[in-house]
Design a protein with these regions (language model features):
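Short, charged/polar micro-motifs that form catalytic or ligand-binding hotspots
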Residues: 25-32, 120, 146, 150-155
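Extended, H/D-rich, highly charged conserved domains that either
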Residues: 1-2, 13-113
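Phosphate/oxyanion-binding active-site loops and adjacent basic polyanion-contact surfaces
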Residues: 1-9, 119-130, 153-160
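Generic structural hydrophobic/aromatic packing signal, biased to beta-strands
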Residues: 9, 30, 76-79, 134, ...
Length: 200
């Protein structure tokens, strides 16, 4: 994969330096629905410390405490899983095992594929843990603001749309969404939110 654009993207988010101005770095939370590892790879290539819920290195085990570590530039929440996650017999939580590691015939990838059962699958761990963290992210404290930047999302996952809409309704204007949208006019879910006086 060519990660040139992803690397430029994360550098722009994490290093928005301007001559003569200092930058007070704040952690960026990535709520990722794609299965690839382009964001994680870009963060690593950019030397940005991040947590994705897995402890270890190339081979890793699930440990959500990694999200609470000090000094993180980013947290990456893979809400639908990842191409490098594997589930083993008698284990509830995923491990990161690259395809280059042999002798693991029993491992299998665990991702939430597009299907009518997608919502039900998100209620199991580790997805339910990731969803709970995402809910907290989307609900800033009363004395703060949050911006959710959405790129490459088609708004076709109803369980994701419900979470975004609930957060917009519950935060009384403290959550702003910025959507990179390919159409000239708003359609579907975005149009409904834009026309809703409580949300807008």
């Amino acid at each position: 994969f060519d990660i040139t654009h992803h690397l430029k993207f994360v550098k722009a988010l994490h290093r928005p330096y301007r001559p003569g101005r200092t930058f007070d770095a704040q952690r960026v939370d990535y709520l990722v629905l794609n299965y690839d590892t382009l964001i994680e790879s870009s963060l690593a290539l950019g030397n940005f410390p991040y947590a994705d819920g897995l402890e270890g290195g190339t081979v890793a085990w699930w440990n959500p405490e990694t999200f609470q570590r000090a000094g993180l530039s980013a947290r990456v929440l893979k809400l639908h899983g990842s191409i490098d996650w594997s589930e083993f017999p008698d284990e509830v939580f995923p491990r990161r095992v690259p395809t280059t590691v042999g002798g693991m015939d029993e491992n299998r990838q665990i991702m939430i594929w597009p299907a009518s059962t997608k919502y039900r699958e998100t209620q199991r761990d580790p997805y339910s843990q990731l969803s709970n963290i995402a809910r907290e992210i989307l609900r800033p404290l009363h004395d703060s603001q949050r911006v959710l930047v959405i790129c490459g999302y088609s708004f076709s996952d109803s369980h994701i749309n419900i979470e975004i809409e609930s957060a917009l309704r519950e935060t009384a204007g403290r959550l702003t969404i910025v959507v990179f949208y390919p159409e000239d006019e708003l359609l579907g879910q975005l149009k409904a939110w834009h026309e809703d006086d409580v949300i807008r």
